[in-house]
Amino acid sequence: MNPLKKLASQTAVYGLSSVVGRLLNYLLVPLYTRYFLPAEYGVVTELYAYVAFLVVLLTYGMETAFFRFSKKEESTKVYSTTLISLLISSVVFVGLIFLNSSAISEWLGYSNHPEYIQFFALIIGMDAVSSISFAKLREQDKAMRFAFIRVLNIIVNVGFNLYFIVYQEYGIAYIFIANLFASVITLIMLFPEMLSSSWVFDKKLWKKMMIYALPLLIAGLAGMTNETIDRILLKHLLPNTDIAASELGLYGAFYKLSIIMILFIQTFRFAAEPFFFAQEKEGNGRKIYADVMKYFTIIMVIIFLGVTIFYDAIKGFLGSEYHDDRGFLVVSILLLANLFLGIYYNLSIWYKLTEKTKYGAYLSIFGAIITLSLNFTLIPLLGFVGCAWATLICYFSMTVASYYIGKRHFSVPYQVKRIALYLFVTLCIYFCIYFTNLNMWINSLFLLGFVIFVYRLEKPKLSLKL
């Protein structure tokens, strides 16, 4: 089967689960923004930002290590060793958090709600254990089972949210309880994979995996700094503390409006990581990586234009308390930032294939330094608009750095000029939209024109590939 077709088919299956799941999850945004004030939603936004850090910490790069070592060692032994490692670390983590939940909740400013911390400890622990079984499904190309469990998780989460918030009219604590129920059911659904494990812990293999994975952990933590630190710092750095929680809630809601691009990136990564490793030994592997990058970028810029053109319709998903004039600019900046993040993920294959994962850590730390310095500088001046600019500058800088460093270690013939052309045309269209007050449907002609433009340039290659 044509490698690009295989990647496309796998992405479609993973994408179906992510699209259906995320769209169902997306329904929670209008729910939350209609039942909770921005200050209340700010609590949800902040706590989930911390969760993102802790999930990375608790999986410590073992998913990617599992993919790498499954190609070199006996897959059953690799899975068993990884599963036992994650089980032990997760149990220890949950126990420590429960013992210190009161102190942690007081430190975060939620001293009356230590149960929030306990709920999240259980969620994070179960999700960390589940992650390796999901990785096993991906490694075995069991995309349908992967998709089914992912969608079930979201359906359960959304269902309990609707029951607790709409029917029972409970408070925000029940958002976390709904998530906890979903995590429990997901773990139960993955029991067949876990029970099929040989339950053998290979200490020598584990050490090798940890050496490979630890730089990825550092990269992951630095990456989470880039993705979520703005929502952690925002309420602490705003000069007007009276509106800090409300501003955080607004920013969290606007961040959700960029979900379509984040969704595609996540979907692509589920399929692409095992695909890239599988193509490593192929003679034309590097050419395939270059083609994937180009077509990935095309899809990303189309998503960018689609969301910005139809923003007025999309913002209707938010409650009236969340309609703010800063929304369009912030969402546009975040979309562009995520576009560069997606390109960076494509580029990052060079240090994974060459086992120079320390460079992933270096690049992420480089990005984290930019993110932290810009957030501390821009938030007091621009509020959450400064958060968005910091994210864009960070991801753009990481992309450029990864490209030039990667050229020296693992040269891939990326079509840089063609990709740059598409980005330039996209930005020209965006500025036409931003600085004019044309009707949304008239603006959509720009999108149609861009698609035709791309098709005319790529048609010979598409015909050849397909």
Language model segments and positions:
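Hydrophobic transmembrane helix module of multi-pass membrane transport proteins
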Residues: 84-228
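Signature of the first transmembrane helix
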Residues: 2-63, 87-100, 123, 154-158, ...
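N-terminal membrane topogenesis motif
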Residues: 1-26, 67, 77-80, 84, ...
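Alpha-helical transmembrane segments of polytopic membrane transporters and translocases
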Residues: 40-58, 231, 247-265, 294-298, ...
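Interhelical loop/hinge segments that connect adjacent transmembrane helices in multipass membrane
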Residues: 1-3, 7, 172-173, 188-227, ...
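Specific pore-lining/lateral-gate transmembrane helices of multi-pass inner-membrane transport
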Residues: 69-85, 250-364
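Transmembrane helical elements of multi-pass membrane transporters/channels
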Residues: 10-25, 153, 175-186, 190, ...
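Membrane-proximal transmembrane or re-entrant/amphipathic helices at the cytosolic face
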Residues: 412, 431-466
